[in-house]
Amino acid sequence: MFIKWGDRLMTKTLHLTKVTIRNFRSIKVAHINNIGDIAVFVGANESGKSNILKALNWFGTDKPLGGDDIPVEFLGKENKEYSKKPIIEAYFEIVNKDKFKEKIISNIKEILEVIKVDINEDILINFEDMLNKIQFLKFEKYADGLFKTYIYDDQLEDITKEFYDCFKNVISKKTPLDLFNLIYEEVLKEEVKKQNIPENQISNAVANIRGNPNFNNHYRKILDEIRTLNTFEEFYEICKRIENIVKSIPNTSVSISIPGRNIQLNPYNIFTEILTKFNSIVTIAFINLKPKFVYLDEEMELKGAVIKNTSWSNTLKEENKTTLLMPDFLE
């Protein structure tokens, strides 16, 4: 089995250097190190080579682990240790720093626009200096589909906390709690506007929604969870806890009394939207850098999470009957 990505290396932003796969299908643990432009896996039939491709393909999605991908010993029972450990750890080197910085800065500006935070250009310049320090990224993917990102300098020193401290300055030193409240208010205003409420009644309508037990009770539970952490270093854990609360909300509409009439709103849908926007505060900065893999099977048909254009398959015809894997990063 070949893993190959060569002639377009410099058009990519990231390059996979090593990966560890644990407890995926038949794989107990597999360490693949020193990955260059071409890597060759040699093994007998049914030795698990194809499961490496399947693992990397799953890694490039947001899906939780399920079906045949879960090892037999973990089926049919809750295993907390299994869910705590990452299924896949993958290290990537940044091979196009300019493109990396351009994409991250662009995404952060998008975040600031979405959450209505003014852009401080001087601080943004300092943040660009922070991006210059980053040379490697580590992505972890867990059985529930959760991703975590760790940031390293050229000496492989973990500078994730330094990154978040710098990021916090970019967003005007607001805490996760500040930002959740800001997003909550904005989403409720948008929902009220959809109901054709007059402009001069929007504030009162939002206050009525916030005071309704169907919203206020869930809101307070979420605030309690955020307060226990409330740092960007713990951002992923905060989002996971909020998600658990949102999942418990009934997916039904409730009647809300606002000035002049009653309206129907679905708390589950609204809190889901709030969680999505809240989660994007940090993750959107890296979301488009998450690797997605595509490969050719023995019949030379394209498989995987990303569909490549025909020029890729045409250049690989000479590799017939060989399984090829190409990570598709930022183009």
UniProtKB/Swiss-Prot annotation:
Pfam families in alphabetical order: AAA_15
Chain sites annotated for binding ATP: G43, A44, N45, E46, S47, G48, K49, S50
Coiled-coil spans in chain: none
InterPro entries tied to this protein: AAA_GajA/Old/RecF-like, P-loop_NTPase
Biological-process GO terms, alphabetical: DNA synthesis involved in DNA repair; double-strand break repair
Keywords (A to Z) from UniProt: ATP-binding, Nucleotide-binding, Plasmid
GO MF: ATP binding
Keyword Nucleotide-binding: yes
Domain of life assignment: Archaea
Name of the protein in question: Uncharacterized protein MJECL44
Native organism: Methanocaldococcus jannaschii (strain ATCC 43067 / DSM 2661 / JAL-1 / JCM 10045 / NBRC 100440) (Methanococcus jannaschii)
